[in-house]
């Protein structure tokens, strides 16, 4: 299990997400951005718009995705979840 923040995933806050894969982190971040946008959190609106627009810009989206996967791979395992 590893930890990444909303900010590490392109968002504006330091909410921590936990997961075993980069894909889990991305899904958790997407849910977080949707919830923040629904709640009217204007600080999260740019990141939410980027998330929604990824499918329209596949090359840029793949660059972002590879960056997240690289960052995730470089993170240490969480101490309290290490096996």
Region annotations inferred by a language model:
Residues 1-83:
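Metal-centered catalytic cores of metalloenzymes
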């Amino acid at each position: 299990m590893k930890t990444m923040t909303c900010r590490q995933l392109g968002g504006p806050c330091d909410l921590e997400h936990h997961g075993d894969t980069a894909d889990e982190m991305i899904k958790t971040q997407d849910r977080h951005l949707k919830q923040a946008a629904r709640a009217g959190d204007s600080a999260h609106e740019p990141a939410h718009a980027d998330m929604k627009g990824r499918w329209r810009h596949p090359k840029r989206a793949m660059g972002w995705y590879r960056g997240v996967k690289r960052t995730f791979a470089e993170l240490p395992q969480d101490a309290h979840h290490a096996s």
